[in-house]
């Protein structure tokens, strides 16, 4: 049977790259999932209200 070769450096390089990416990501805007859910619910309610108000309700 053929044996698989283990690459010793690929895992370390991969994790180091991810750590660098997440360190740089700290400057980004962070939004909580609850905020996104509430914003989506409000947008949905507003769209339904406009649809009902203009006679487009199914």
Curated annotation (Swiss-Prot):
It holds the Pfam family Sec61_beta. Residues 55-58 are extracellular. One of its GO terms (cellular component) is plasma membrane. One of its GO terms (biological process) is protein transport. Its main location: membrane. InterPro entries: Preprot_translocase_SecG, SecG/Sec61-beta/Sbh. Coiled coil: none annotated. It is a single-pass membrane protein. It comes from the Archaea. Keywords: Cell membrane, Membrane, Protein transport, Translocation, Transmembrane, Transmembrane helix, Transport. The chain crosses the membrane at residues 33-54. It is found in: Cell membrane. Residues 1-32 are cytoplasmic. The keyword Zinc does not apply. The keyword Membrane applies. Belongs to the SEC61-beta family. Component of the protein translocase complex. Heterotrimer consisting of alpha (SecY), beta (SecG) and gamma (SecE) subunits. Can form oligomers of the heterotrimer. Involved in protein export. The function of the beta subunit is unknown, but it may be involved in stabilization of the trimeric complex. HAMAP family: SecG (MF_00751). This is Preprotein translocase subunit SecG. It comes from Methanococcoides burtonii (strain DSM 6242 / NBRC 107633 / OCM 468 / ACE-M). The gene is secG.
């Amino acid at each position: 049977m053929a044996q698989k070769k283990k690459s010793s450096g690929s895992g370390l390089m991969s994790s180091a790259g991810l750590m660098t990416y997440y360190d740089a990501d700290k400057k980004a805007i962070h939004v909580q999932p609850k905020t996104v859910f509430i914003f989506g619910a409000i947008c949905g309610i507003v769209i339904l209200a406009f649809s009902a108000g203009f006679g487009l309700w199914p």
